[in-house]
Amino acid sequence: MRDIEEILHEMGLSKDDYELYGRYMAKLSLNLQEVNKKKAKLILVTAMTPTAAGEGKTTTTIGLGQAFKKLGKNVAIAIREPSLGPCFGIKGGATGGGKSKVEPSDRINLLFTGDFPAISAAHNLLSAMINNHIYHGNELNLDPKRITFPRTIDMNDRSLRSIVVGVGPRDMGAIANDNFVITPASEVMAITGLSLNYKDLKEKLSRILAGFTVKNKPVFAADLKAEGSMAALLRDALKPNLVQTTEGVPAFVHTGPFGNIAHGTSSIVADRIAMNLFDYVITEAGFGSDLGAEKFFNIVSRIGNLPINAVVLVATIRALKLHGGSKKQGEDVEAVKEGSKNLLRHVANIRKFGVEPVVALNKFPTDTENEIMAIGEILDSHGIKWALSEVFEKGGEGGIELANKVLSSIGDYQIKRTYEVREDLKTKIEKIAVNVYGADGVIFEKKALNDLKKAEEIMNDPYVCMAKTQYSFSDDASLLNDPHGFKVRVQSVNISSGAGFVVPILGEIMTMPGLPKRPAAENIDLAEDGEITGLF
């Protein structure tokens, strides 16, 4: 691994443009958004509906960047920071794999440059100030039963989904129901990822909805005078992090909102700075095209004024077989063919946005030639560009064919949005459900309708950031492949007025995950020489 300062110098940066975090990590100045103004090409990486283990989207993003470098392209990648929850939960580390990783992987996976702790601290500071205000006389007349801002922690802990605070003597504060969300679902995480500078950051923080008064009036962070101290905690967290891939490609790793319960992409400032310094930027969006990619098209690219010049859609034989209903071990060509319906629907989704995608078939050792041939023939018959990706095993060399296909697909596309910003919220939600998920319609619970009414009273033209299972186009994780004849049910709607969007809660989605029966944490250890093992 090279010293990060060598890579920074190759990027043409001076010492005023960055701060070192040891030998291998750095933070970049926000002022780099204003230099060069290159007309870089932005390539978005998304996926088909995933299995629980994921389909290798991060690995593909990293490997594709390395393949671009081998072809002599001036390229950087942009991915999200890992959350401790999944690292210790079901997926383990989230820094790629094999010969396509970002380094130093153990540092990045475990706390990195301190962004997540800073975001958690800023979030919980507001929670503390809300309760403190109520305790010291409650001048704003906040209703303790109508506090809408939760607490946060970067850990999977189902016991924190619903709690009671203030239990004990009177000096413990008011007794009230409360809850935690995981840090990637925090509105402060979303705000950090969507802010362009410190002024923008403070403005967004000031608009966070804390709760309502006993007379049903909204109370915001600005009313509690919280935004300044919150922004102070986030000063360094807003600056994007730079590391490197296995083969020395510059890698922006910044912010970490989940794609199923938040907007699911790395920060806007990371993408904007990368596009000023490089000719090609490859950025990743969480889960399938119905989640992270939809939000990138409809929210992130709008706020950041970002182009989308190509889309890579990651697929695996494993996921195709799952959606095809495979019940057996080993080769199952018929299941691959049946599961292709899911992949084709994701292709159709990307085409609706006005972009022609390239499918990256992420190869696993268990894949057979017959299975690969079967899906290849289907993609060919539909006129879909595709390539086998072997970047896990071979690094950049294993992504050369994919890189060439992606380069040939790059264009100045006119993006077609799912909804207009000025449309009412019900219409926006229905358009996403029908046009992206393939639903027959939307069922709004009474609470959801009340939430929407309140959101439209206190927000101007908000975006919609759906919270939905990643395992199905529907809101039911058991409806695999290409479901039809369903309606999605909106249980409630969270108001993220600071971030500028509402979050409709579909089905049984949880904003605080739990650990599995055998969490990855059981396999992680620290050796006597200080090496961390079992994380990947």
Swiss-Prot record:
InterPro entries: Formate_THF_ligase, Formate_THF_ligase_CS, P-loop_NTPase. Pathway: One-carbon metabolism; tetrahydrofolate interconversion. It is an enzyme of class 6 (ligase). Gene3D superfamilies: Domain 2, N(10)-formyltetrahydrofolate synthetase, Formyltetrahydrofolate synthetase, domain 3, P-loop containing nucleotide triphosphate hydrolases. The keyword Phosphoprotein does not apply. GO terms for molecular function: ATP binding; formate-tetrahydrofolate ligase activity. Its EC number is 6.3.4.3. ATP binds at residues 51-58. This is Formate--tetrahydrofolate ligase.
